[in-house]
Amino acid sequence: MAAEDPATRRVQVAEHPRLLKLKEMFNSKFGSTPKFYVRAPGRVNIIGEHIDYCGYSVIPMAVEQDMLIAVEPVKTHTLQLANTDPLYPDFSTTANNICIDKTKPLWHNYFLCGFKGIQEHFGLSKLPGMNCLVDGNIPPSSGLSSSSALVCCAGLVTLTVLGLRLSKVELAEICAKSERYIGTEGGGMDQSISFLAEEGTAKLIEFSPLRATNVKLPSGAVFVIANSCMEMNKAATSHFNVRVMECRLAAKVLAKHKGLQWDNVLRLEEVQSKLGISLEEMLLVTEDALHPEPYSREEICRCLGISLERLRTQILTPNTQDELTFKLYQRAKHVYSEAARVLQFKQVCEDAPDNAVQLLGELMNQSHRSCRDMYECSCPELDQLVDICRKFGAKGSRLTGAGWGGCTVSLVPADMLSSFLASVHEAYYQGNTSRLAQEKHSLFATKPGGGALVFREV
């Protein structure tokens, strides 16, 4: 049952090499022993890209890679953070005065998001300090949600230190909201799957209210992650937040066109819901109401009957106020068609026809085309990698995560896995020194993993 608390598992640390190594490093760093450990997984989104923040369902699964944190509560009010990776410097601050710097999304700020989210949810003014050592094996900026996994892990760490309880759903909602402290206007998928994931199954994640339903993936095929080795730091770029705003503006213009009260409309799903029509019908409305040419700020103002000042101060966010044009038609087309593909994907998984793998693969291919052409969130390296994956046997391949770099996910018949991995290695990684150096963490088959939990030593 997804509404329960995150699990607590009692373990013999000596029997788990990664926990044991983390315990030893913690002792070396802080001169003491961790009281507990928390892990939160990364995720791969199988289908449903850039639609969670528009109100639509998505189908992700947790990967086996995760963020793992060793924790010791301390009597002082000092929060001390360290990382097993020397690339990420130590950080220390007072637990009662958390400041998150949006301008520089340094690693510790993601921890602070989760910490502050719990603090604000309970309205706490004084929090205990803690020593934390973080160990992550999710490739950063790869589209596998390493940053959200750290936010979720920090939220559960803080909750556990305080001795308080929340359900997985509540934690997911708090962490989704608190990640926005760093300036990323995400929709909640990453945090939801990190908490609600169950081993062996993907999940249909629905929003408002948040709920997760099992999606049984077909036997005889596996999902393979391949990293393009092009990093995209979501919070450090305006691409992502501009797309969020384009979807919001498209929703408002569509609502106005259909005679709806548009002022409070924020998501494309709200327009469909208010009109009470199907996704296919929403695509026809989009064709009728919006044009493919980019909209200037002045044209948007004319469509909505508002002043440029009102658009700038009441609708545009600080990080989109300098944009001169917005592609409303393309973004709405992607969102409504992708939302329909998610439902079709789930239906194929439920019906389990003989050609299920073929059908699911085609939906993934359609998704990538839409991400590339309508949402414009791909890049040449991702497109090349998708083509290579299809050439060597993937029934479907698409970018996963925000895009503009990061990973692809491919649906590969199980009996072709070995030859597929060897061929993709040769075609994409071999011969490129920087890609080859990262390949160990860049090309792997994965299966649905479990969600966030707490480890306590026996």
UniProtKB/Swiss-Prot annotation:
Record's keyword annotation contains Transferase? yes
Q: Which UniProt keywords apply?
A: ATP-binding, Kinase, Nucleotide-binding, Transferase
Q: According to its UniProt record, what is one Pfam family this protein matches?
A: GHMP_kinases_N
Name the GO cellular-component terms. Answer: cytoplasm
* GO process terms (BP): galactose metabolic process
| Protein EC | 2.7.1.157
**Top enzyme class:** transferase
Q: Per the record, where is site Transition state stabilizer?
A: R43
Q: Which InterPro entries match?
A: Galactokinase, Galactokinase_CS, GalKase_N, GHMP_kinase_C_dom, GHMP_kinase_C_sf, GHMP_kinase_N_dom, GHMP_knse_ATP-bd_CS, Mevalonate/galactokinase
Which ranges of the sequence are coiled-coil?
Answer: none
Active site positions, chain numbering: D190
Catalysed reaction equations from the record: N-acetyl-alpha-D-galactosamine + ATP = N-acetyl-alpha-D-galactosamine 1-phosphate + ADP + H(+)
- Locate the residues binding alpha-D-galactose: R43, E49, H50, D52, D190
Give binding positions for ATP: G143, S145, S146, N233, K234
Highest taxon, organism lineage? Eukaryota
GO MF term set? ATP binding; galactokinase activity; N-acetylgalactosamine kinase activity
Q: How does it assemble?
A: Monomer.
Protein purpose: Acts on GalNAc. Also acts as a galactokinase when galactose is present at high concentrations.
Q: Which family does it belong to?
A: Belongs to the GHMP kinase family. GalK subfamily.
This chain belongs to the protein called N-acetylgalactosamine kinase
